[in-house]
Amino acid sequence: MKPKLMYQELKVPAEEPANELPMNEIEAWKAAEKKARWVLLVLILAVVGFGALMTQLFLWEYGDLHLFGPNQRPAPCYDPCEAVLVESIPEGLDFPNASTGNPSTSQAWLGLLAGAHSSLDIASFYWTLTNNDTHTQEPSAQQGEEVLRQLQTLAPKGVNVRIAVSKPNGPQPQTDLQALLQSGAQVRMVDMQKLTHGVLHTKFWVVDQTHFYLGSANMDWRSLTQVKELGVVMYNCSCLARDLTKIFEAYWFLGQAGSSIPSTWPRFYDTRYNQETPMEICLNGTPALAYLASAPPPLCPSGRTPDLKALLNVVDNARSFIYIAVMNYLPTLEFSHPHRFWPAIDDGLRRAAYERGVKVRLLVSCWRHSESSMRAFLLSLAALRDNHTHSDIQVKLFVVPADEAQARIPYARVNHNKYMVTERATYIGTSNWSGNYFTETAGTSLLVMQNGRGSLRSQLEAIFLRDWDSPYSHDLDASADSVGNACRLL
């Protein structure tokens, strides 16, 4: 039997009067909440719209991103990058009808030095900015001597100057480097012969990790007045400049005593920017994609595209034309013993012309030091052009003329360019086009994909056509008398 329960009604506490908001404040709060929602919605739509606009711009510019790999999205950079092509035109070499007028290499270098505030990193092959190596008083050496003088002023002003240079395999003047050491610069010699059986053939500057020069010019007074050179200066482009600094840091590491190439490079040297995920930049006010490649493959940390792979990718994706200006072109490992055939680039050019109908123009330098075997390979490539194959390949030799005094200057009067341009891409490198430069020798290249009038690509195309159509370009069957003894291949 259940016990009898006593129920008692609980008393509920009386409610305190609520602090009610006046109706006008409630309405104001609701209005503010509604406005905030609309602002948030507008911001979301703006972000989505901007992304769609940029995607549309790049699709409009490039059609698709097949050139860089499937389904890859470029990593963005918001620097207002400015690119300027710079040239060294040898004294006495005139282009009277040319519309191109680019700044000189010496002007660009002196401008970079004048603007350096915190750091300057230089990767270089050798140093002869004075003409001590010729034991002459050559007036055209003055520009190189001025560059050296300005370099010596930087370290005393607090600029951290670092120079990575290839360790010479034999006697070589070190006067310039000794002067820079005395001024406070740091110098490390990279023994590429020991590391990869090659040399450090790279030629670039990085200033304040914001601006840089990359091109064909050596730290040689002749590269400013007696040798034809081409490079690019990138201003206010810290994203690319910092990435180029990573390549320099690898050289700097290898310049330490007893160093060796790591089996796996530390993550410090890795990059996010490469052929598959190029950097999305605004270049000279228009959209562009860019990345830096490096050689040889053992010097490519995670993410870095090897130079040869980048070069071949540009060749393989050309659909209209391929214009190439290079000092040496040899489908061989010319510094290997015994010599070995190396057709990687040659096959790519033949395939482009034969399979896709791409117009190929190859402008190779000819001077007193040209490798004599090069002629046979150039004739073989040019022979592909006939009425049966409909392959449009042409090869010319560029000869820099020299008067009696200029002819006495050693290792001068040559077209030292190392670039390629297609209807889609620009490739500016530091290597000659033969096998060892990509398998053993250290080099760097800048690749830019940009269309439109006034683009870097269109400017480089104009320079190539100026040279190709100039009186300094000669067919392979030209008479040797037309160039005197300045060309070994005729």
UniProtKB/Swiss-Prot annotation:
GO terms for biological process: immune system process; inflammatory response; lipid metabolic process; myotube differentiation. The active site is at H201, H201 (proton donor), K203, D208, H416 (nucleophile). PROSITE patterns: PLD (PS50035). Mg(2+) binds at F438. Glycans are attached at N97, N132, N236, N284, N387. CDD domains: PLDc_vPLD3_1. N-glycosylated. Proteolytically processed to a soluble form that is stable within endosomes and lysosomes. During transport through the secretory pathway becomes proteolysed by cysteine proteases, thereby releasing a stable soluble lysosomal lumenal polypeptide, whereas the transmembrane-bound fragment is rapidly degraded. Its transport route to lysosomes involves ubiquitination and the ESCRT complex. GO terms for cellular component: early endosome membrane; endoplasmic reticulum membrane; Golgi membrane; late endosome membrane; lysosomal lumen. Disulfide bonds join C77-C239, C81-C237, C366-C487. The chain crosses the membrane at residues 39-59. It comes from the Eukaryota. Residues 1-38 are cytoplasmic. InterPro entries: Diverse_PLD-related (IPR050874), PLDc_3 (IPR032803), PLipase_D/transphosphatidylase (IPR001736). The catalytic domain contains two conserved PLD phosphodiesterase HxK(x4)D(E) motifs that accomodate the phosphate group of the nucleic acid substrates, with one nucleophile histidine residue forming a phosphohistidine intermediate and the other histidine protonating the leaving 5'-OH ssDNA/RNA fragment, resulting in the cleavage of the phosphodiester bond. The homodimer has two independent catalytic domains arranged at the dimer interface. Homodimer. Interacts with APP. 5'->3' exonuclease that hydrolyzes the phosphodiester bond of single-stranded DNA (ssDNA) and RNA molecules to form nucleoside 3'-monophosphates and 5'-end 5'-hydroxy deoxyribonucleotide/ribonucleotide fragments. Partially redundant with PLD4, can cleave all four nucleotides displaying higher efficiency for ssDNA and RNA fragments initiated with uridine and guanosine residues and lower efficiency for cytidine-initiated substrates. Belongs to the phospholipase D family. This is 5'-3' exonuclease PLD3. The gene is PLD3.
